[in-house]
Amino acid sequence: MWNVSKSSNNLGAYKLPLEAQTPPEKISPFDAMSAAQPEGKAPHDQLQNDQYPIQQAEDRGRHLVEQAEIQAHVQHCHSKAPEIGDATKTQSVSEKLGTAKNSSCDASQILIGSKNDDFHKNKAGSNGDINKSSDPSALRCSLSPAPRRVPKSKKSYGAATIGGKVYHPHEKTDSTIADFLSRSLSNNAYRSERHLRKRALAYLNHISAEKEITSNACFAMKDVNSFAHKQSEWLCHLERSLWRDEPALQFHDRQQLGNEVLGLKKPDDQSPYFKPRAWKISDEAASAFAMMLKGESGPFTQDQVKVGFEICQEGELLAGRLKIQPRMAFRLKNRHDANRSGTHSVKSLSGLDLSADVGTDIREFFQVPVMSGTSGTSSDVVIAARYAAMHAGLKWSAPELTIDQAKHALIDLSMDFFRRNGPAVVMALRMNSLRKNQGLPYKEVDRCEVFTHSYAEIHGAISLTIDGVDPADKVEVKNRLYGYTLDAKATLMKIADRSIRRGVRSKVDIRSTSTSLQTPQLRRVLEKKKIVQKVAELYSEMGKAGNSATLKEAITKSSVKELLVNDKPVVSRDYALGEPLMVRSLRFSHDHEATSSFGSAGKTPAKREVDTLCDNSTAFDIVMTPFSVINAKAKGDTISEMKVPHRPKWKGLPSVLYKVTASVDLPEYAVARPGFGDIHSFNSNKAFSSEFSSVRNSLSHAEKMGFIENSLKPYIKHDPDRESFDFKHSIDELADAQCMLQSRKPNSTLRHNEYCAKLELWDAKAIEVGMSRPVAVATLIEFNLEMLSAARYIEDEGYDGKLITNFLERQLSWFGQNAALNKEVTLKKLWGLPFDERKAVAEKVCEALRQGVSLCVYEKNVEGSRIRELSLLNFNAYDIMRGIELFLSSKLLQPPTGAGPTVKSRL
């Protein structure tokens, strides 16, 4: 995306004074905003004619740094009592900034664009010749004091725009968003706060792995035997082969052009370098490219062979300015870039807009970091290598490397270039200039956290170009990016896992280290813990309420209101219209737990139900979740209402009502819950025999259900009024049979029936209160908390995560309502599922999870039964308080008190 060149000794760009920054209105647009450039215009041609702004700033910054370094040295050597706050006591300014060439990898904590007011205040006094006097006091008089540490200012955040307006974090902002915006420097547009959080979490989950990739790439360039070093050197030789006999140079003085690249000669109006650059080419790249233009065939130096990536960019630039048509046409035909809708992070006050970019869509799907979209510059370098190799009759990959090794070497070179060198410096400078007009303060961040390109964006661009995918074939590009992004995510996950197992302990920044070691799972646990803390705070506030009105006001104003109040009467309406519902009664782990404390066995009934639905059991393979079917034309008991046998473990507990919501946006298989059942209950647990255990791993979900059904046929209960001695195979069919049985027994309440299928957590719609309203309140809170957590899990892990993948595998194992596909065929269908289809399913699942559950009562009447929706706000104060207390008692280390302090969570 960014066609920028790293600068050796680029001190001014590292810590540039504010007055030297380029105003926003003069910021030159980068070329890569469009997928293809106009004919004859290379990337750098899109920049405006601002004469060497960064080079001038570098000179000024270098002068100020040298002045400050002298001051620091003198004060350190001659001051009798140096102050503790002296920033130069242990490390010089030049050491902080990494003045040595090619030493970026040794300065991982450099802050980009940091400002030091002492540099501006102390410009005078450094012009005198310090060698004229050996008197230390004279020296101290002629020099101003050494720069001191600048006091920390108010925390600044990266620019994020929602609806064209800059988003400002506040005390209620999600910690994930606040952490992301505080540690990174970016200017991107988002659809909503939830969209911002999704991108933020992907960034936080993988930034440590990306930093490790970048660091490894940097160190690889020090090893002449590394793949990256060999490929970089080969790029230099390939590029030189193109310019040795280039016909376009016949009309130009090659010596003059070489000197212009080196900055030794001023370009005339006929020179391709007449139009000034917006940045300075690095000394190593300039010297190497000047050799090529002059036709010199001497060997490259050790420093020159390290900048092959930059040299290829320079070759693309000059080819465009010289209008070398074959090379320009090859670039246009093969270049891959992002669709940024004409926006740019250093130009657009409303932020970089990637909403129309297919690559970004896929990266969000897999929850990997998004920065600026597919890297056009990375694609350019591959194009340059392929074009040169084609003309020279050589391979584009280094002789000793395989294609795969060369590809990963290019990815490393690109990561090192974008995240440690020129692009990070220039982007930080220009985004900070733009921040003035956005009403945001100057911001300093670690260079690796300036938004240039993420690993997946670079990986995708290089892979697409190497594999020769036609940029005009949008379907093929999309399909390939799907696979490339999956590979990139696997790499990031592998590195993160390895880092955690190593137990990385940084000596520099404990805070960033502890944050980097937080896995997505741990981060979700911490988020859940914070929500429990907020419920505890609400409980304390409610304990201070003087009346029910004040208590309800505290609930409605609470940040956890959504966990308690859900007034969407969809269940009662649909039930009255004749749609059957599925019911599962909650239960304790055993009868004794029902008489002891709530959740004393380690899980509450609600958590046990959630874990069953999500197949979180480590001891069992949850193939099915048996339930009862109820409908408005019949009156049947739930399991919690059973009188014989009397089991305290489920007696009077709430029940969960389930309903699969059809949607025109979803394929039929996603809303089907194939299974079998009967009007009478049967011993469904009898199916899990040793025989089933021996074959289950080789069976698809549908095959498992078929095996279970055949095993349970002997347990179908005898009934003289039965039409068939076989199972029903649809919920509607069982509901019809229930109505027929009710018609034969109009005055009787039917015993619960049983249906075996696999319900999902997002099928849950309501909590039937049962005999205890406080228990119902506790169940409501926990169920909604777990559903919210599940939605975040899916969004955090990406739509290829375990929960969605397992669901799709189960659903795709069915062919129609009853036919089963084997495991091999099922997996082929799963991995052949179109990206858009998988995404649509996952988004609908998350939407259903975020809707949560409401409270209701299941009532029987003369005509049958009905569902009556309830609101928590209609409960009395005691039931609400006691219910919240029950919930907290299962989550907290100390029992809560009505007006007591917030206590620690044991989640």
From Swiss-Prot:
The keyword Transmembrane does not apply. Residues 1-47, 116-157 are annotated as: Disordered. InterPro entries: Pathogen_avirulence (IPR053508). Signal peptide: none annotated. It comes from the Bacteria. Residues 1-11, 124-136 have a biased composition (Polar residues). Coiled coil: none annotated. Keywords: Virulence. The keyword Isomerase does not apply. This is Avirulence protein A. The gene is avrA.
